[in-house]
Amino acid sequence: MRGCLQTVRWLTSAWQRPPSYPPLSRAAPCRFFNVSIPRNAQSRKPVSDLERRIAAIPIDRFRNFCIVAHVDHGKSTLSDRLLELTGTIQPGGNKQVLDKLDVERERGITVKAQTCTMLYNYRGEDYLLHLVDTPGHVDFRAEVSRSYASCGGALLLVDASQGVQAQTVANFYLAFAEGLKLVPVINKVDLPSADPVRALDQMANTFELDPKTAVLVSAKTGLNVEQLLPTVVEQIPAPVGDHTKPLRMLLVDSWYSTYKGVILLVRIFDGEVRAGDHVGSLATGLKYHVGEVGIMYPGQTAQSVLRAGQVGYIYFNPAMKRSQEAKVGDTYTKVGSEKLIEPLPGFEEPKSMVFVAAYPVDASDFPHLEDSINQLLLNDRSITLQKESSEALGAGFRLGFLGTLHCSVFEDRLRQEHGASIIITPPTVPFKVIWKDGKEEIITNPALFPEEDALRAKVVELQEPFVLATLTFPEEYLGRVIELCESNRGEQKSLEFFTATQVILKYELPLAQLVDDFFGKLKGSTKGYASLDYEESGWRRSSIAKLQLLVNKVPVDAVSRVVHSSQVQKLGRVWVSKFKEHVDRQMFEVVIQAAVGRNIVARETIKPFRKDVLQKLHAADVTRRRKLLEKQKEGRKKLKAVGNVVIEHKAFQAFLAK
C-alpha cells in the first residue's frame, strides 16, 4: 500500500512540473512540427552506385537499340541472354524476363513492347545500353513503330532454320524508313536444321545487308552472344541531344498502376527531368508535378534525374488518373518553356480493322465484364469500345481490334486475368457506304448495315477494305498458295524467288477474307512453312450484302454478317444446318432461314413434338380420325402464331464458337 502511495505522489509531482525542452537555435529547423513532404524528396535520397555510374557516362556512350524479327524467331530469349551478360539479371533459369503478361508466356509471343536499361563495360569505359524487345506479329505493328522512335539502331534477327519470313521483310522496311542502323543477327545456329549460309544469302539478296557484319548466335545456349554487345557499341550510333537545352520529352508508351496512376515511358531528346519538376503536355495543355523518375533495370528503379538521350519512366504526384490524358506521341516540356521548343513528330494512331461483339454468358455478369474490359483498356488504347444491346444476348460491347491475334489475346486476358465468361461473335471488318447525298459512312456493326430497300433507294456504292498481303513459303507449295489466294478473291501483284527454293508472293486480298481464318488455311496448304504479313491497301467497290438468320421469320440480331454476294449461298446453308443442331424442339414447328433482304437462301425445319391423338380411336373410325388430325393441325398453327421460340444462351454460345 505504501509503495502505491509513493508512486501516485511521484506521478502527481511530475505532472505538475513544467516540461523542459532543449534550447532551440533560431537557425535550426524545427524537428517537431515539420510534417510536409517536399515534392522533390526523391532527389534527397542517398545516391546509389548504379546512379553514380550512370551520371558519369556522357551521351556519346549511350546506345538505344531494339530487336526486331518475325514472330517466334527468338527475340525474348536473346533479350534474356543480353540482360545476363550485362549483370542486369542473375544468370540461370531466366525465361522471357521481359514478357510480363501471362498470355505472352503461355503463347510464347511478345504482345507488348518492353524496355530495359543495361550497363556494359567495354574497353574500360561504361556504356549505357537501352534495349527494347518488340512484338513480331503484324497485329502489333504499332508497338514496333513506336519503339523505333526511342532507338538509334536495331538487331535484325533471323531464324537460321526458317530464314527470312514475311514479317522480317515488313519490320526491315519499317526500321529502314526510320533511318535505323541495322545489325544482322542469325539465331538458332545450334539447331540440326539450321542453315546459316542460306539465311545470310537471303539477308544479302533481300535487304542488301553485308553478310560480313552479321553475328551468328544461339540465344538458347548463349553461343556467341557475347559478341553482340561490342557490335552494338561499335555499329549503332549514339543518340543526339543536349541536356542544357529546355526539356523535350516524347511519350512513347504508358501503362496503368493501381497505386501510382498512369506511368509514362518517355524518351528525353533535350534537357533533363527530375522529381518535383512542373511539366506540361503540348497536346492537351494539362500540367503535372513529377512524382518520380527512373529507369527499367529490369523493374522500375528510381533515379534522381533523366538526361537527354535516356529512355525511362515517370509518374506524377498527384497521379494522372485518366489514361486518355496520356496521348502516345505527345511532347512534354517544363512549364514556362512551351514557346521555346517545337513539338516532336508524333505517331500515327492505329486504326481498328477487326470488330467483334462481346456478351456475358450470364446477363447479371454485365457489370463485372464492363469493369474487366475497362481495366484492360487502361493498358491498350488501340482497342475501341462501344456499348450495344441484343434482344437475343442482352447488353454487351462492340470491340475494335488491330487484327485477329490482337482480338484473341484480349479474349484470353479477359478469361485468365479477370475470370470473365463471355460469348464472342465471329470477327467482322468495317464497310463503307456512299449515300446519294454524297455522305460517306463507315459501318462496323452488321446490324446497322442498310436494308435492301434503303440500298436500292439511297445508296450509290458499297466498298470494302483490301490489304496487300506478303507471303513467303517454299517454292514447292506455290500452286496451292496461288489457288488459295484466288479462291479468296485475291489479285496477284508480284512473284519473286529470293533464293532457289524460297518465294515471296504478294496478293491484294479483301480484309474480310483475311480475318476468316486465312492464315490457318495458308498454314494447312504449306504444312506450316508459310508466313504472312499485310498492310492496308485502301477501299474498293464491292458487291456485298447483309446475311441474316431468321427463326420463324423473326431476325436474330446477334447473328448477322455482311458478306460478299458470292458467299451468300454457301454461308447461308452452313448457318441454318449448324443453328439447327443447337435449338431444342418446341411444341410447334420451328423454321430456321438464312436470308438477304426478302430473298431466302437456305432453310431448315425442326419438327414439333407430336402427341398421338389417335391412340384411343377404333381403327375403322375414319371420319373421327380425320377430324382429330385437322384439330391438332389447327392447334399447332395457332401455337406457332402466338408462341415464342425459346433459344437458350448455350445455343448461341455453341453456334458462335469456332
Swiss-Prot record:
UniProt-annotated location(s): Mitochondrion inner membrane
- Keyword Lyase carried by entry: no
Residues holding GTP = 69-76, 133-137, 187-190
Reactions the enzyme catalyzes? GTP + H2O = GDP + phosphate + H(+)
Q: Please tell me which top-level EC class this enzyme sits in.
A: hydrolase
Pfam families reported for this sequence: EFG_C, GTP_EFTU, LepA_C
Q: What's its EC?
A: 3.6.5.-
| Transit peptide endpoints, chain numbering | 1-40
Cystine pairs annotated here are none
The protein's matches in PROSITE patterns, at most eight in alphabetical order, are given as: G_TR_1, G_TR_2
A Gene Ontology biological process term: positive regulation of translation
Q: Where is the tr-type G domain?
A: 60-240
Record keywords = GTP-binding, Hydrolase, Membrane, Mitochondrion, Mitochondrion inner membrane, Nucleotide-binding, Protein biosynthesis, Transit peptide
Question: What membrane topology does this protein have?
Answer: Peripheral membrane protein
For this protein, the record's InterPro entries field holds: EF-4 (IPR006297), EFG_III/V (IPR035647), EFG_V-like (IPR000640), G_TR_CS (IPR031157), LepA_C_sf (IPR038363), LepA_CTD (IPR013842), LepA_IV (IPR035654), P-loop_NTPase (IPR027417)
This protein's GO CC annotations? mitochondrial inner membrane; mitochondrial matrix
State any single GO MF term.
Answer: GTP binding
Q: What is the annotated role of this protein in its UniProt record?
A: Promotes mitochondrial protein synthesis. May act as a fidelity factor of the translation reaction, by catalyzing a one-codon backward translocation of tRNAs on improperly translocated ribosomes. Binds to mitochondrial ribosomes in a GTP-dependent manner.
**Family of this protein:** Belongs to the TRAFAC class translation factor GTPase superfamily. Classic translation factor GTPase family. LepA subfamily.
Its protein name is: Translation factor GUF1, mitochondrial
- What is the name of the gene encoding this protein? GUF1
